[in-house]
Regions:
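Conserved acidic/glycine
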Residues: 119-210
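Active-site metal-binding loops of divalent metal-dependent hydrolases
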Residues: 1-2
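Glycine-rich ThDP/TPP pyrophosphate-binding loop and its adjacent helix/strand module
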Residues: 6-22, 27-157
Length: 210
């Protein structure tokens, strides 16, 4: 959860930097789920949780790119419900990679307050997150560089325009609308804009690593 992005980040970074053959999987709930739903550097813009009662103003940390900056860490973002094949492939590659690996999996949480079906539909919620462009699927495999191949693979496509619909299906966002309607509109628009910029950045990484 938020631990990996925040109070536990120093330890995680030390493990990845060591170069040891260690596999790490982070279940990204975008908050501190185990301690009751506090805001973290994993939390997204506009998200309402403890310590961010008026919606988080800033965007989430790019944990994946920090790990990728070492150049020798296998990194992947997955969402099992959205693309099981990509998730299994990433896990298999991470296990086979002779060095540190980090897999960040999108993890719907009870505290997200999924409106339609709750956690019974968490797999569908993952699909919606990827389809909307809220969560991106990609992998960075340093081993491919030695084979003369592009180590960065972007699997997910650009958002289909359902970003606001996705936000409005989760109480962690909609609970901002009634008390602060203008702020909610501004933060939700900002969140979508940042998501589009993030995807454009990922597309540029595909070209950069060629």
């Amino acid at each position: 959860d938020g631990w990996a992005y925040d109070i536990g980040f120093g330890g995680l970074d030390h493990v990845l930097a060591s170069g040891e053959n260690v596999n790490v999987m982070v279940f990204d709930t975008e908050m501190y789920s185990n301690t009751g739903g506090q805001a973290s550097k994993a939390s997204n813009i506009g998200e309402v949780c403890q310590f961010a009662a008026a919606g988080k103003e800033t965007s989430k940390k790019s944990l994946s790119e920090i790990a990728m900056s070492y150049g020798y860490v296998y990194v992947a973002q997955i969402a099992l419900g959205a693309n099981p094949a990509q998730a299994v492939k990433a896990i298999t590659e991470a296990e086979a990679y002779p060095g540190p690996s980090l897999i960040i999996g999108y993890a719907p949480c009870e505290l997200h307050g999924i409106a339609k079906g709750g956690m019974n539909h968490c797999q569908d919620e993952m699909k919606k997150a990827v389809k909307a462009g809220y969560w991106n699927l990609f992998s960075f495999n340093p081993a491919l560089k030695a084979e003369g191949k592009n180590p960065f693979t972007l699997t997910s496509k650009e958002g289909d325009g359902s970003y606001q619909e996705f936000l409005n299906n989760e109480a962690r966002y909609t609970r901002l609308v009634k008390p602060f309607p203008e702020r909610a509109e501004r933060l939700f628009a900002k969140s979508e804009e940042v998501a589009k910029e993030r995807y454009e950045h990922l597309q540029k990484l595909v070209e950069l690593y060629k």
